[in-house]
Amino acid sequence: VNDGSSDCCGKLCDEYAKEDKRIKVIHKKNGGLSDARNVAIDVTTGEFITFIDSDDYVTDDYIMTLYSLIEKYECKVSIALYNTFVEGSKPKVVNRVYREDCQTNIKAIEEMFYQEKYDTASWAKLYHSSLFATGIRYPKGIVYEDLATTYLLIFQSDKVAFCNRRIYNYLLRRDSIEGSSFSSKKMDSALKVCELMESHLDILGKVMQAYQCRMMSFFFHLLLKMPDGYEQRNMLYKRIKAIRWSVLCNSRARKKARVASLLSYFGLGVVKGVFHLIDRR
């Protein structure tokens, strides 16, 4: 999908399509990441779907690794790990003892929300195309779209296969490291994500403690970027207060989420002050 690219990407896509008739190219006006994905999902005829962001790249055996897991465990979703690399550098190769397993969909969603093995990113995963036949699409016009979508796809699959090979390479831009500025769009997107997820409590109720931990990490991520005096700060604090005791008492919660939950009893200013001090060190 050429989502309104201003460089030669569209031409490059057309050249690839001439070399391989299986490749379909769609040229469209820029509509954002979710819109580009949805347009592709609507016209795909393949049996499987995977997503690769335009800045990232994968290993030569990316598809084969994920497909082999699906074949071996007879499931509809497979997940692998990823490397993160900074602009101008190369990913570090980490050699680990190979490990793979297969879990129920509920266990997989739990581990994803606890951020124990993998996270909610749409990439580094292979999905059977039938999972999208239920009407699942990525919410347009917002950021954090994967948080509101990936668990729904996993829930549609009875089982989920996983391996710890790092076959996806995610580019971390320098402005992301330095901290991109907070915007009203990010807050509006966060509220939309909450609204979308809360409309599926029939699913999330099965993993409520894990869901609360993931949302707590999400809320504190927003808080640390949010300027003091921001009008929706109190609304965010209200959501934090509603689940902080549950997260604080949950031994599977991330250490940072538990510490932040404890500090929140002393006010949001204390949370921001402590974490900014840690970052400077």
What are these regions (language model features)?
Residues L12, K28-T44:
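Glycine-rich, basic loop-to-helix element that forms the pyrophosphate-binding segment
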Residues I49:
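Short aromatic/hydrophobic "clamp" motif used to bind/position activated sugar donors
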Residues A210-L222:
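Amphipathic alpha-helical repeat scaffolds of TPR domains
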